[in-house]
């Protein structure tokens, strides 16, 4: 966790897994503290992805100013660099208005950016990308080993995407993985100018599973299938991150004949539970020390943060 600092603007970050209840508690806290909300949900960026993302309703958005919601067409993929730039702009503008900022979301990699570096400064040329792309997976691993005589450390060589990324950066920088890792650790995070503190909202797993089931039923009743039908001609499948999102990918499978209608709700529930498990692990292992709050026993939004 960032050390407390009196010369940095305070930044509160509220994280939590899917269906835990972040939206309502964030709204209550923001209303009580004259704050504005900066979304840290990788799917709320996209216009039209409303039902399947449990996007705040028009009424909820009207209660508190929100940032980074509905900022991209569905075919325009957001990435970490774009998110960081947009979030920094939003935070700077909020501070200039003399208001508090509350970052809210469950997208682990984006959340991590508020507490440390998430991207290195290595620029990979098109020529290097083409050179690596021409290699078979086995050849890529072998080339990477040649460039790293001390070894590959904890790199998962069975993951082609990670091997490609590592090899591209070694070739582009002329450095070993160990050297790149050491340089990365010395980088300041993109939000080092803020004193960020984290609270993770959680619930008992049995209760959370019940909320997931209710949420899926409500989404289907609200017209999730029709939402996906509208988004497909708008370019949903051109954006893999959006098309693979839980709720959307299952409906796509339904519409393309790979999933029977009778199995739709159960499939979305199953995949949501798996996502929640991954989110919990990420929050525990990848985010800094934080305060954990049980949403089921929380009575006042003031109890979310201790500073």
From Swiss-Prot:
Keywords: ATP-binding, Magnesium, Nucleotide-binding, Transferase, tRNA processing. ATP binds at residues 16-23. GO terms for biological process: tRNA modification. It catalyses: adenosine(37) in tRNA + dimethylallyl diphosphate = N(6)-dimethylallyladenosine(37) in tRNA + diphosphate. The record marks 107 as: Interaction with substrate tRNA. InterPro entries: Dimethylallyltransferase, IPT, P-loop_NTPase. Belongs to the IPP transferase family. GO terms for molecular function: ATP binding; tRNA dimethylallyltransferase activity. This is tRNA dimethylallyltransferase. Its cofactor is Mg(2+). Its EC number is 2.5.1.75. It is an enzyme of class 2 (transferase). Residues 41-44 are annotated as: Interaction with substrate tRNA. Monomer. Catalyzes the transfer of a dimethylallyl group onto the adenine at position 37 in tRNAs that read codons beginning with uridine, leading to the formation of N6-(dimethylallyl)adenosine (i(6)A). Substrate binds at residues 18-23. SUPFAM superfamilies: P-loop containing nucleoside triphosphate hydrolases.
């Amino acid at each position: 966790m960032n050390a407390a600092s009196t010369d940095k603007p305070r930044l509160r970050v509220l994280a939590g897994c899917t269906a835990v209840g972040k939206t309502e508690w964030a709204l209550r806290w923001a209303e009580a503290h004259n704050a504005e909300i900066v979304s840290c949900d990788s799917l709320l960026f996209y216009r039209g992805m409303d039902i399947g993302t449990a996007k705040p309703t028009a009424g909820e958005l009207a209660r508190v100013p929100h940032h980074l919601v509905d900022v991209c067409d569905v075919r325009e993929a957001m990435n970490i660099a774009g998110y960081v730039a947009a979030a920094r702009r939003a935070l700077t503008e909020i501070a200039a208005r003399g208001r508090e900022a509350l970052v809210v979301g469950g997208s682990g990699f984006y959340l991590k950016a508020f507490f440390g570096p998430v991207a290195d400064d290595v620029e990979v040329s098109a020529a290097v990308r083409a050179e690596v792309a021409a290699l078979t997976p086995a050849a890529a691993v072998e080339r990477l080993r040649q460039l790293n005589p001390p070894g590959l450390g904890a790199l998962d060589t069975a993951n082609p995407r990670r091997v490609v990324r590592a090899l591209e950066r070694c070739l582009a920088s002329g450095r070993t993985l160990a050297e790149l890792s050491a340089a990365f650790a010395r980088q300041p995070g993109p939000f080092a100018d803020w004193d960020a503190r984290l609270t993770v909202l959680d619930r008992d797993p049995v209760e959370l599973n019940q909320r997931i089931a209710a949420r899926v039923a409500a989404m289907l009743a609200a017209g999730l299938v029709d939402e996906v039908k509208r988004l497909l001609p708008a370019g949903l499948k051109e954006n893999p991150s959006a098309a693979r999102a839980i709720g959307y990918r299952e409906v796509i499978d339904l519409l393309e004949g790979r999933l029977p209608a009778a199995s739709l709700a159960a499939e979305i529930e199953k995949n949501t539970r798996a996502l929640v498990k991954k989110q919990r692990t990420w929050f525990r292992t990848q985010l800094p020390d934080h305060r954990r709050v049980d949403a089921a026993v929380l009575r006042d939004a003031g109890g979310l943060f201790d500073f």
